């Protein structure tokens, strides 16, 4: 088999979700280790802990001026709302920059929707004590499915600023909510945080001409929600 054919066959074997810290990631690591050994090489798995979470409840419902369920995906590691959820005011802050919050200092009773959740946008949400944040995904005509949405985790750099329960919705729903003047929403988010185990696959190929020298090659084999 030619090299490109072999490479493609390995990709086919790895064609499944391999989120870091899950059994599927472990399965992918063992598959790669097996390929290394079948090729006559030696490898090992190097385990290390990573923060993880499991969302057990998530939901969004428009309360006023009309009632409607909105499909949503909760942000991992963003914290939880009280059991049963919480009804909050809804505010669209567009880019989430200072100019979008003129005259607004305390948003502890408000779910704030922004176009994207940059570090600066999140910092301002923390500064304003927002009760929750909502981010849109895709184009104005997209559903979560057509936007290829998947659960993301709140990054460490944002968590250091504080935890705000986060939600992802489709740009289509976001557009309709702004257009129709949504005033209040009921949000539900419950999740458990824990320490999971991830792993690197290490293999060494001894050099032939300069065995005392080393070249390090690295690549991700896991699917990382970011």
What is the role of each PLM region?
Residues 77-99, 151-226:
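Soluble metallo-hydrolase cores and metallopeptidase-like ectodomains found primarily
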Residues 22, 70-159, 163-165:
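Extracellular/luminal Protease-associated
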Residues 3-23, 32-42, 111-115, 132, ...:
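Catalytic-core environment of secreted peptidases
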Residues 1-5, 9-111:
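Noncatalytic luminal/extracellular "stalk/propeptide" segments of secretory-pathway proteins
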Residues 27, 116-117, 169:
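Short beta->alpha linker loops
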Residues 13-14, 125, 177:
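A generic structural signal for nonpolar/aromatic side chains embedded in well-ordered alpha-helices
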Residues 51, 120, 138-141, 174, ...:
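Surface-exposed, flexible loop/turn segments at secondary-structure boundaries
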